[in-house]
């Protein structure tokens, strides 16, 4: 069984879903360094986008080394559905770009880091022509480590920072500690690194901090990653029809549920409800704002938000949700076993589970078939979905690094950003053939050494455009990408899509309590009126002033999506 070889960059939620890791708490203790543009009375925060960003961005040059079986469309990933042919692998980096220097990289790591001088690291360093030395840090406490390192005078050559670790003063520290890569990558300069030139422009825009191009991105599809999964085999067997409206879903849930027979319709469907009712994205705070009739509105202020919560509450109140869902997030266990056992037939989670659930059940439960419902509009019409960010993990180069080190880092990135179907991609993602993996019937299979050594390292320096490839389950790869394409066709970009925004520190925690209140409301522990009061309190505690701050940002910079 091959690991999930989708290279789509994760949001915090999808990364947690696929890696079962916990993000660190917000750390403090950093000096407030040079803030981004558009600051408010010294409180920090701001962005560079729209009019000013274009001159900073690298030129986009499509990579024609490999042709995907399914091209990207409507913000989807590219897809590959054929068997892997080692003999047919292409070369995307024909000569070593590295000059043989040493580069230290600090990165989050989940699990036990491999020894420094292992076969995978040696193979990668030899291919690139750079001696990469890893400073792996526990991903669960990474933000605290970042705070200490960025506050010190000793910063590694490269530091990887996921978007979910950019709390507190870290965005302003990024501006103060890391180099401007524009002189190496802006405009046509990027053509020296063809794989970096093939990274989508939206992903590069997310790399602008403090008015400079400072990051190297891990690109992602901008289509929602939350899929309403269902047991297609049981649906077919029972004759259930897929719902096309919120009312039809409720009726279907009633038909499915039989508590005496230990079968329920679903788990907590709140995330899907937000999509069904067209609620602005909650994946990152700036995405929750939208200009409506000249006024910026935050997602929690909308009628759609309340309607989505009320609809989800009704699912729970009617007893259609599995008892496990009543426990809430903190007590939830892995949904897989009970989904496989048919205790519930629908749940929503990250799109990566389309593959992982299929792979889990392939041998022991050959009749098992998972599929994803298309998101429907609550009233039976087309839904309105909102784009997620096109990159959310970044690598930064120290300001103190000499040009030779910057060039060596870019040499690393040009290899790690190689597309699927190349020798560079296979080495980056699977290691050395025969040492870390073998290919059986067109499917790469990692051995124990591969699973121990070839894990979340080089891919975090930079990655190719979002990619889905499952040679062991090509139908799943096709289904995932085609789902993204259909959902992408009804996806809109909100006012601050693609922008890298640091909110003023005094307001960064203002909306942190809404998620817990949502969960309490849908489970009947709180009322919709409690949310209305919380929104009123939010406005008074700074929400209205934050709105004014965002409006000035929009007036000064223009919308990123425009």
Task: Specify the residue positions occupied by each region the protein language model found.
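Extracytoplasmic/periplasmic substrate-binding proteins
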Residues: 273-287, 313-454
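Helix-loop-helix "hinge/cap" segment bordering the ligand-binding cleft or interdomain interface
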Residues: 208-273, 289-332, 397-407, 414-423, ...
